[in-house]
Amino acid sequence: TLKEKVRLATILGTFQATLTNFKYLRNVWKKNTEEERLLGVSLTGIMDNKLPSTTGNTLEVMLEVLRDTAVQTNAAMAKQLKIPQSTAVTCVKPSGTVSQLTDAASGIHARHNPYYIRTVRGDNKDPLTQFLMSQGIPAEPDVMKPDSTTVFSFPMKSPSGAITRTQMN
């Protein structure tokens, strides 16, 4: 179930909160990390699920249950690990790359439109940028950094029946 997935992700995140020895950062960050132990359990594609996105306050209730699951799981695991409980636990955040990799709507947002253009920026010295250009992917110089950055455009199609922002009130 989704609740079990949130519980397991929270356990992993709480384990991760014990990793505070950042050799490449100043000690103030180690201190901050050990005090706050922030925890993010990322849900994405929420609006791709028809039930919570279309029926009254179902989404709100579901997110509250999942948040409570994450907070309670974190408290129990922190106690076992003898570390402070996280000062903040979040279950929804903006999503970019993960939603693209899984073809899911970003975070809690509906998809943009049935058809849209997805843009991706690349540094002109990056071999991937050079490869995309050599393959004829539509591209143009970035308006803010035309000498160093290229913007690629990819046509996108939302899945059939996907909820789009134009359907939201």
Enumerate the language-model features and the residues they cover.
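Catalytic alpha/beta core of large soluble enzyme barrels
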Residues: T1-L25, N32-E35, P94, L101-N169
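Internal maturation/activation junctions in enzymes
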Residues: T20-N27, G45-P94
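Electropositive phosphate-/nucleotide-binding environments in soluble metabolic enzymes
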Residues: G40, E64, D68-V71, G122, ...
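Short capping micro-motif at the N-terminus of alpha-helices
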Residues: T87, Q100-L101
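Terminal amphipathic helices with adjacent charged low-complexity linkers/tails
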Residues: R37-L43
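Short, electropositive, low-hydrophobicity segments enriched in small/polar residues
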Residues: T44, N49, Q100, R111
